[in-house]
């Protein structure tokens, strides 16, 4: 049996726009992938990474089609096969882990039903064996309560947990080819280490071939044997991972590598603000009235200040944002805005309260109406809050698109015609349209490539300096926190472990073991970093972090 599993020859993919015109989005790409090998596909949003990944299964998104070239899988040209043959192959011999797990699960079905569906439907194994296999994978992917988590619905697990469930779903049938499209995007740094190590080990044990699509160069350094750099649907260069990251030949690759070090310098601000924009006072919150997911939280955010909220998946970061925005009334305590108590429930707040507190969500796929154009999505707050219509609204939409570095032609596109990064930028523009006093940024850069993320952070910083807007910045990317936040709040299982100026939090030695664990988990752009962490820093990840009394 040949070691070569996948080969693409002169692959071409075209997309049809709303005006009917076609645009080539992948142009004559050649690719080879052997069994047991991981090829990283990197590049900016719109580079064609996900399109190439889907083409490995002879599949194209709605509005796109493969117009030329060959996709040879285990000796068979998939472009010559009928749709029924391709359906039998997809999910069984080749599996895809999507960038947005939230948009990939049926909210009305339990997780086990969806994870086991392909294996049962294709006759790969019985229902009993499929569930047993799913539970085994849940454990390997470090999901809590692996024996019972499959009986939950998608909304009953965190975003990071749902992403790992999707990884289990892809691996259930033991495919020859795994296509991983940003599989750790939604994961906190400590979970990311565990999942990266597990996925890498499973690939090695099963001799899988894998396409690993990512914009995070530090992540791809830990798992890829080779890297292919893409730009505007064309290959820029390809080579061993260490060579591409440390000695690239092409100027564009050098730009990608340097973009990861692009930072916004932090402003040292130790003192708490005297007149905060938002004050969270003694807040306790619960979804079911029995289990508290937030416990007596006190946080203040001042005018023109960036406060980062960090912690692992399930620590309560996004729940805290829901309390501030009124989506989840607290069981105890309250939130003040500019010194006045805010109504706990969203429906009781004034239109001006709603305008002044905006939120950018973690999952852009579920935050936009798929049937509305970009202009309609951005224009809605312009009409609702300011009464703008017609040409005035259209002009303001174009201005907002320019602020987020998107061409005016995007105004008429639908969300399904955008890349992951483009979708998130539209969500940012929608928040900016309301001209708020504070924006709650929930993983705002997690779906963006390094170059675009750096641009967005600079944009947010520029807006803050010009308008004194405040940011509550929820993230698991501590590299971002270190570079943009004035103060940092560390959370664990609904408690605040510690909070203070970002400089103090990140300057060793850390006061709390849990904070030290988080900081030690930030990936570095070295190919040996993951092995070094697992070998030399293992004691950190065995800590049963206790929240101070």
How would you name each of these model-derived features?
Residues 57, 61, 325:
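Helix-to-loop junction immediately C-terminal to a conserved catalytic motif
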Residues 144-147, 241-279, 290, 502-549:
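Charged, flexible cofactor/metal-binding loops and thiol motifs
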Residues 77, 129-148, 392-409, 520:
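Conserved ABC ATPase "signature" region
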Residues 152-157, 161, 414-418, 422:
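Conserved ABC ATPase signature
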Residues 65-77, 333-344, 353:
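Conserved ABC transporter NBD signature motif
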Residues 174, 435:
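Conserved catalytic motifs of ABC-family nucleotide-binding domains
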């Amino acid at each position: 049996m040949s070691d070569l599993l996948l080969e693409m020859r002169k692959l071409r993919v075209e997309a049809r726009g709303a005006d009917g015109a076609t645009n080539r989005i992948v142009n004559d790409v050649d690719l080879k992938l052997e069994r047991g090998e991981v090829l990283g596909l990197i590049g900016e949003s719109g580079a064609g990474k996900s399109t190439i990944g889907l083409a490995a299964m002879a599949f194209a998104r709605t509005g796109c089609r493969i117009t030329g070239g060959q996709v040879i899988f285990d000796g068979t040209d998939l472009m010559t096969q009928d749709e029924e043959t391709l359906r039998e192959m997809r999910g069984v011999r080749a599996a895809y882990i999507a960038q947005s797990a939230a948009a990939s699960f049926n909210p009305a079905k339990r997780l086990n039903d969806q994870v086991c569906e392909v294996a049962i439907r294709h006759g790969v194994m019985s229902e009993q064996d499929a569930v047993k296999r799913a539970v085994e994978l849940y454990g390997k992917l470090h999901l809590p309560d692996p024996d019972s988590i499959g009986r939950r619905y998608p909304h009953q697990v965190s975003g990071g947990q749902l992403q790992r469930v999707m990884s289990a779903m892809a691996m259930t049938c033991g495919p020859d080819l795994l296509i991983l499209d940003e599989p750790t995007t939604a994961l906190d740094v400590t979970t990311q280490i565990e999942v990266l190590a597990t996925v890498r080990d499973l690939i090695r044990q099963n001799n899988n071939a894998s396409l690993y699509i990512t914009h995070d160069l530090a992540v791809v350094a830990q798992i890829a044997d080779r890297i292919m750099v893409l730009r505007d649907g064309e290959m820029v260069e390809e080579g061993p991972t260490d060579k591409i990251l440390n000695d690239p030949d092409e100027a564009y690759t050098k730009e990608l590598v340097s973009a990861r070090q692009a930072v916004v310098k932090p402003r040292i601000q130790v003192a708490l603000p005297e007149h905060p924009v938002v004050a969270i006072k003694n807040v306790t919150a619960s979804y079911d009235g029995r289990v508290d997911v937030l416990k007596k939280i006190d946080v203040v955010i001042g005018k023109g200040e960036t406060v980062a909220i960090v912690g692992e998946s399930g620590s309560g970061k996004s729940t805290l944002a829901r309390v501030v925005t009124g989506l989840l009334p607290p069981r105890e305590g309250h939130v003040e805005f500019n010194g006045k108590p805010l109504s706990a429930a969203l429906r009781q707040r004034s239109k001006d309260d709603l305008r002044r507190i905006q939120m950018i969500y973690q999952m852009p796929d579920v935050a936009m109406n798929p049937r509305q154009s970009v202009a309609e999505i951005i224009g809605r707050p312009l009409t609702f809050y300011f009464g703008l219509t017609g040409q005035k609204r259209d002009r303001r939409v174009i201005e907002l698109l320019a602020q987020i570095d998107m061409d005016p032609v995007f105004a008429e596109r639908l969300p399904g015609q955008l890349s992951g990064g483009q979708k998130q930028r539209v969500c940012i523009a929608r928040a900016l349209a309301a001209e708020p006093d504070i924006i709650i940024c929930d993983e705002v850069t997690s779906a963006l490539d390094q170059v675009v993320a750096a641009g967005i952070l600079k944009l947010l910083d520029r807006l803050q300096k010009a308008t004194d807007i405040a940011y509550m910045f929820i993230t698991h990317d501590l590299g971002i926190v270190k570079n943009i936040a004035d103060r940092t709040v560390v959370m664990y299982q609904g408690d605040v472990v510690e909070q203070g100026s970002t400089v103090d939090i990140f300057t060793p030695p850390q006061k709390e073991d849990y904070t030290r664990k988080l900081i030690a988990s930030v990936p570095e752009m070295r190919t040996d970093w993951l092995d070094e962490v697992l070998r030399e820093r293992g004691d950190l990840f065995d800590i049963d972090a206790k929240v101070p009394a």
